[in-house]
Amino acid sequence: IRNLRAAIQNPQDYTARSNLMWAATMAENRLIKLGKRTDFECHQMEHQLGAYINCNHGEGLAVLHPVYYRHIYKYGLPKFKRFATEVWGVSADGRTDEEIAFAGVEALADFIKEIGLPTTLRELGVIRQTDLKKIADTVAIVPGSYKQMSHEEILEIFKECY
């Protein structure tokens, strides 16, 4: 987060850009995920979205992740609480674990807006809300996610993102 903010502020900041590339490499090769429970369902949702509207994967995830996380954070509460406190610096003082986790999801949504990424499916090129069911029905539902989604729940997430 710190490096992305620095790189946006100064695109010539070689250290910030190098650190971003290293972090992206670690995230993409899945080395840091070994032995840990992860959730890939939002990526499955975005793959289908991208197939229909040809959007950039990262921009699609920027739109989907906050809404998706609002639907699942209670099912992965320890990890979402840690995400909130460690990544976003959310204070635990006087808050329940659920409140802390939710504050982290909202911090992510705020950050996405701060850096100028799209926040709605309309911004990505989804013209008609009626297209959402067709897209949702083609999403592969993968095992191992914090909450097993149905196609109806995926459609609801798409509608909230519209």
Locations of regions flagged by a protein language model:
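Active-site segments that bind and position negatively charged phosphate/pyrophosphate groups
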Residues: 1-106
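C-terminal charged capping/lid subdomain of soluble metabolic enzymes
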Residues: 91-162
